[in-house]
Amino acid sequence: MPRKTLLPLVPACDAAPRRKRLAAALLAVPGLVPAVSQAQLSGAAAEPQTFGSPWDLRLAPQLDEHPQKQGGKPATFVLADHTGGTADQDLAAKGSAEIRRGNAVVKADAIHYDQDTDMADAYGKVTVANGGTTFSGPEAHLKVEANQGFMTTPKYHFTATGGSGSAERVQLLDSERSVFTNGTYTGCQCSTNPAWYIRGSEFDFDTGADEGVARNGVLFFQGVPLFGSPWLTFPLSGERRSGFLPPTFSPFSSTNGIEVSLPYYFNIAPNRDLTITPHIISKRGIFTQATFRYLSTNYSGALTGEYLPDDRIAHRNRYAIFWQHQQNFGNGFGGYIYYNKVSDNLYPEELGSTNQFVNGIQTVYQQEAGLTYNDGPWSVLGRYQHWQTLPPAVAPYGREPQLNVKYAKYNVGGFDFGAEADYSRFRITTADQPEGDRVMFNPYVSYGLYGPGYFFVPKAQLHIASYDLTTTTGGVPDQAKRFTYSIPTLSLDTGLVFDRSVRLFGQDYIQTLEPRLFYVYTPYRNQSNAPLFDTAVSDFGLAEIFTPNTFVGNDRIADANRLTAALTTRFINPATGDERARFVIAQQYYFTDQRVTLLPTEAPATARHSDLILGASVKLGAGFASETAFQYNVDNNQLVKSSVGFGYSPGERRVINVGYRYTRQNPTLSNEPINQILMSAQWPLTRRLYAVGRLNYDLASSRVVDGLVGFQYDADCWAFGVGVQRYANGLNTSGQQNSSTRVLAQLVLKGLTSIDNGLVTAFRAGVQGYTPLPPAPAPLSRFSNYD
């Protein structure tokens, strides 16, 4: 017998098949079918596309949701195998019965519907769906439009957030709020036997507020209770919200003992938040950390404060302040503040953040505020800069204050010209060091000739520096306090580019041959009176040999009469333009001695040529890449410096890095010799298990500089990681590096929370190319399982 359908106030009619009647009913009520996508088109793209005559079916680019007009009542649709009842009063539907009203759908084996009260009583395999939330159970009693009522022994699923669970009873308050009695909640897609779930005597869910509250809630993982609370709140999705974050636990250490922390997060506004984290340190006391972050269209920043009152070991109050602020005033004006301060010299070693395990202990803290202006060729910086320096670091000079102005114009009739002017007052916290003012002016002009296979760029520049010292180095009699240097520099940078087509290893390439010459001439000027405010010897490498000055900074300008010659060849994929390989060889030739030295006690450089520099970069298929650089002394037949690195990454979360660093000790330079091998990797052992490791081993001393080994397991709705790290932890009394070991762990309950005491941070810093485990899949749209 055909199924019957009945609309309120309309007699039943069973002449048409059920699907056709349902389709006709849906099409007859505009706005009944929600949009399949939240994205909205506009313009011509949003207009329906027609085919043939005006009476043909049309393709619409989107489904539009039309809200119910105020005062209007949506139509009610009833479908079933058998229907009966009294017109305009009640209705009985049996056999695959359905009631649809607005966005609400009730399905059951049998439904009794009272039209006056809008009350539906459903029995047998009941399903209630409204606004992307689905409830199923043996029976339900509710008002259809208001979505108010109750169900017994329901199972539920939030389509928009991915959460699900079961309970003894659910009280439906409206389309967004519901109360469950003696129930469970999980974010796992597998709801029959989830890896984690929360069990509570009562759950209050509000999908509109994206919040769930469990009373007498206990968090279970793999059937084991992890955490319990009489009042447990949690988000239903990944949106930020105020509340407690997962606690962290650090194992016992000789410095601090056991440490436990419990952060609380305040979601003040979409662009502001505050995290307060009390730490219980068994050997020292209660250590509190607070971080305030803010973001606006014109400014952003973060302020962190740390405080430990009456340290039980140090017997004093200890604190730290870290503030970063960026400001855009408009019209090219900006500003910034970097203020960092710790209470004592041992603070970073004993109470520093987890970043110290990766980057080493911080011993220099910047305290700086500045104003900037940028407009076309103009760039202006005014700042006040100070440093807090902890031993054994050497204190740098502060600029108290500095005003720097730069001007640059390009391609004005083929000329590039500009200038830099700078005034700085240098101060230092170290005793018996020179201090004073320096005014510097550096104008320049160049003219470039460029062609398809060549370039020719002569350049002239002038360095003027004037000093007014308030204090000089102790022990130097009659040292001048006011003096000025004026030093010109001429340079010529030129090169050619040849190319040809070649075929190597069955592949076509474009090979280039690029000879380059760089000549620089700077006359000698005695600069021994000038202090070293911001100057040091420049590194010697491919990035530095084409610069006119062998010093960085403005207190030394090297006299020069030298020529740099380099030859580069590259292999380029003609189809994509991707550079597959590059090889470089370069050397400098000196026509006169370099008399200007960093310190007056140093001897002038008398060599006639520099060390030979060789470099290579290779990228092959299947994710293989290599970077190699050598500095070789031809006269002594010695390798001065080398850096060799190989990387292999055939796919995501598959990377192997191998590197070697070598630096020969130079008696004339206070450099530390380096002879180290570095290996790091991330690699899958199974489909879900990954190994991560890093080893930095010093071959000269036969010791581990730093190391890391760990594993990560990725399941459908949870992930776990563990690692052991050996790291540098300051210097001992003899100046040797101390090392310590710590255990790292991470537990991620996807869809709920993550507990991590620095594991992912250590993996990111230790393994180049490391990729974190994937997050939980995004929840489905509320229209994904649309009925």
UniProtKB/Swiss-Prot annotation:
Biological function: Together with LptE, is involved in the assembly of lipopolysaccharide (LPS) at the surface of the outer membrane.
Gene: lptD
InterPro entries: LipoPS_assembly_LptD (IPR020889), LptD (IPR050218), LptD_C (IPR007543)
Residues annotated as signal peptide: 1-39
Transmembrane segment boundaries: none
Cellular localisation: Cell outer membrane
Record note on quaternary structure: Component of the lipopolysaccharide transport and assembly complex. Interacts with LptE and LptA.
Record key words, sorted: Cell outer membrane, Membrane, Signal
Species name: Burkholderia thailandensis (strain ATCC 700388 / DSM 13276 / CCUG 48851 / CIP 106301 / E264)
Family statement: Belongs to the LptD family.
Protein name from the UniProt record: LPS-assembly protein LptD
GO BP, sorted A to Z: Gram-negative-bacterium-type cell outer membrane assembly; lipopolysaccharide transport
